From Swiss-Prot:
Name of the molecule in the record: Sorting nexin-3
Domain PX: 20-139
Binding residues for a 1,2-diacyl-sn-glycero-3-phospho-(1D-myo-inositol-3-phosphate): 63, 65, 89, 96, 105
Superkingdom in the source lineage: Eukaryota
Alphabetically ordered keywords of this record: Cytoplasm, Golgi apparatus, Lipid-binding, Membrane, Protein transport, Transport
Entry keyword Lyase: no
Matches recorded under Pfam families: PX
One GO process term, biological-process aspect: late endosome to Golgi transport
Membrane topology designation: Peripheral membrane protein
Length: 144
């Protein structure tokens, strides 16, 4: 909604819900397993009013390998959109389960999802984006 110059914003203009919004937060990393079977997953909380999404509010857990598969599928599904890279893999001699490494990866995954989910073509036309963000039973094999 355009605002006229010199006229102060009304309360409704300042605090009303935007026409369409999509908010994503990656939080609450959890490490599971023992030894070589250890992995970390992250909670993805999504709030939206975009009709392409089935739920207004959702929370799912995903691990890094899920993000890798999601990115590959998204790249194939959306050939007209440049999909950003994921945060890099952890170096061999780095403890990938240290708090610092987990937080750096969480921040990188957050940036990745903000860019991807912020793209108008993907927001409204990507079935895999909606499923990845909202379906707790999401499985890459459904999309390959």
């Amino acid at each position: 909604m355009a605002r006229m110059a010199g006229r102060p914003q009304t309360f409704d203009e300042m605090y009303s819900v935007p026409e369409s919004f999509l908010e994503i937060e990656i939080r609450n990393p959890m490490t599971h397993g023992i030894g070589r079977k250890m992995y970390t997953d992250y909670e993805i909380v999504c709030m939206t009013n975009i009709p392409a999404f089935k739920l207004r509010h959702s929370a799912v857990r995903r691990r890094y390998s899920d993000f890798e598969a999601f990115r590959d599928i998204l790249e194939r599904e959306s050939t007209r959109v440049n999909i950003p890279p994921l945060p890099g893999k952890v170096r061999v001699f780095t403890n990938r389960f240290s708090d610092e490494v987990i937080e750096q990866r969480r921040e990188g995954l957050q940036r990745f999802l903000e860019i991807v989910a912020g793209h108008p073509l993907l927001q409204t036309g990507s079935k895999v984006l909606c499923a990845f963000l909202q379906d707790p039973a999401w499985d890459k094999s459904q999309w390959i």
